Amino acid sequence: MSTPTPFDSEAPLEKLLRIIRRNPDDMQELEMVEARWGSNPRFSDGTSFRFVRAEGKTFPKQRCLVPASEFHMTVGDKQYRVKLDDGNFFYLAAVWEPAIAEWPLSFRVITVAANPEVSRYQDRHGAIILRRQRMQWLDNSVPESDLLETPPARTFIVEEITRGPRQKALAL
């Protein structure tokens, strides 16, 4: 499999990212595929929505995971990296949408209210799925409310990015 990389919320719309999902042709099989981050703008007045709020919604189908070693956020002219306190990689909970006409396979990241470390910079962040929870998310085997939660305090380390992302190589 692939090495998790920083999840860059400023990535250009045309950039394809890797997601992990159940193979729609064989639900027993997991697959890693490339997908565009953002919904088809054809169905939303020309806007591609990259996020979907967790509150009040259920996601019974088309769940996927975005492997990440950290995520980035921009506040004013500064950019920050956010990574798990223990240095481990994680997944962002997401839902995928099939390719339609000229729009490729795509996904949207599910968001939750920001935890204390991130809330100093922004109100929300992607829902974090830990490695031990990945199959629970993909298989819908536990209530969504147990997985799509705001992480507790001291879950993240937030660092200002002064030049390119730094990370160790991690294996899936």
Language-model region placement:
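Short linear sequence motif anchored by a di-proline
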Residues: 1-172
